[in-house]
């Protein structure tokens, strides 16, 4: 059997960003985002922003990163890729100049034939209908909609005028509100105008002196309106499913919604199962600006952007989740345990299958050879990708140790590194106009050794990557048959640029002896048209999964929590919901009772 454990285990390249919003400070972080996934000639390809390449796999589990030809717009965001006939078509985003397209019959080696474009766009998506007609969708803004148009099949230029298809509506769609957990309401017109006038006063300009088009954009900055972006179209049983991202990539609630229509250009109605892709909790939250694909075994997958956003708003990773359509045509995505190990077979699979193993490492006792203030060792076991242990030096003798508390059978360990890069200059020239950047082209290395022990004194090697030539910062150690261990020690560590090592998650999975939790009791109360309060009576559990949906058998949305209270702000005004709370511990998952939301 093969297994995945999000984020996708691949090398994520560093960027050096000169962001004008940060006063020109050089920000250094890793990024991959906005993934387009396709199947072409039996192989799987993922094109993601800022990777300089394409990820290739034969099984959706093991991926390799291949450089793409230099003549492609590799520094442009949100690459869109589709298969049409014998060709793979590629394009990406630019705001101020026409975006060209490219096509090839050989993804890895090219050549790529250029197809001139005639207008700028951002977050593109091309869709080929069953009748051969071609449609195009784009948009990334909190002031303008997702646009759509038909394309000429020969030139791939627009036919007719663009049409506004969907717009943000955070006054009625709770999950479109910005902020952590949708905590920020849209600003009033009075608030927007007051902040806009304050901006003009601070900068010493009048509205007439602003460049064309800048006034609406600046007002949008003060509006607290969501970014509606990242369109992706799929068709199933005659219905068109227009997926879109909300409300902003820097939030834990970054996800994908869905509108449905009988026509590729609408009119569209909000899907009954909205949001479609939503993962606000767990170790690594976020599941927005993605793409959906049916594999060669008729399994649907959704691949999407996951949020870190510590060193830069665009510090992001990529996750892949089972998806599908139910008997009523509702498009769903299973993210209940979306960053736990999941079995992947070369066969048709149940998209609602549970995790292969359970989390054994949450808040376990941690020690280390040293640490920086604020980066204590216990932060490598708190299931929060935004916190980490950081050693006091870059010496390979530094170590991080976990005591599981007793002997367990361990099946997988995921070693997640964070990045704190200081005093390093980019190896090449920063390019771009609005936000200049350089993407690291060199192949860096992340090296470590994982030791195990039953008594804390006698150690054996679980995995030795101390001489690895790879740069895998979310690497996995798989022992399908299991190993007996109580103590784990990560040592002999060397990371990129010779920096002090940082570990955001030493995550351990297996199945402990014992019973699953008792059935959890809870209350769920609607508080306002778009929010609900959930309170859980504690049981012997590590955590809980709050599930909700439009019917008892359609609990397609989930929020993993490690506490007993949560306000969920992802409801749609006027819709009825059913809620269930499941409890999990190191031995299993117990389903709760389903209730109608009052």
Where are these regions (language model features)?
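Beta-rich carbohydrate-recognition and catalytic domains
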Residues: 1-223, 235-282, 297, 306-350
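Short beta-strand elements bearing conserved aromatic residues within extracellular beta-rich modules
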Residues: 149, 448-450, 544-546
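Short S/T/G- and acidic-enriched coil/turn segments that sit immediately N-terminal to beta-strands
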Residues: 257, 446, 474-476, 562-567
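Aromatic, loop-rich ligand-recognition surfaces of beta-strand-rich domains
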Residues: 382-461, 472-522, 526-527, 551, ...
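Extracellular fibronectin type III
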Residues: 500-501, 516, 586-598
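Conserved aromatic anchor
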Residues: 530-541
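Extracellular low-complexity, O-glycosylation-prone stalks/linkers
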Residues: 540-562
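Beta-strand-rich modules
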Residues: 568-589
